[in-house]
């Protein structure tokens, strides 16, 4: 009888040691850190540069201006009057040695 009780105790101990315990809970997930957004670059506010230089000239020489005509000088709205009397150049200033 003692052998049966000893066997029962041993059997209970072995079964207790082999019990299927529940697995430990998984660790909490790591907090998600999103990568920083790319730096903001405003779109350009001008037209892209042309691949070749832009030339704003006529392919031929402009005709001579007539006496008393008004000429548009440059792209700005400024007008130059063509004199009817030739302008004589001023003599050079005297050289100071």
UniProtKB/Swiss-Prot annotation:
Other notes: Can potentially be used as a larvicide. The stable three-dimensional conformation of the decapeptide means it is not degraded by gut proteolytic enzymes and can traverse the gut epithelial cells into the hemolymph of adults and larvae. Hormone fed to different species of mosquito larvae stops food digestion and causes larval mortality. The tetrapeptide (DYPA) is as effective as the decapeptide.
Signal peptide, first to last residue: 1-19
Top-rank lineage group of the source organism: Eukaryota
Keyword terms of this UniProt record: Hormone, Secreted, Signal
Tissues in which the UniProt entry reports expression: Expressed in the anterior region of the follicle cells.
Gene: 15a-2
GO biological process per UniProt: oocyte development
Gene Ontology terms: cellular component: extracellular space
Principal place of residence: secreted
Function: Has an oostatic activity. Inhibits trypsin biosynthesis in the midgut epithelial cells which indirectly reduces the vitellogenin concentration in the hemolymph resulting in inhibition of oocyte development.
Segments for region (Disordered): 26-46
Subcellular location: Secreted
GO molecular function: hormone activity; serine-type endopeptidase inhibitor activity
Family: Belongs to the vitelline membrane protein family.
Protein name: Vitelline membrane protein 15a-2
VM domain residues: 61-97
Keyword match Signal: yes
Region (Required for binding to the gut receptor) location: 20-23
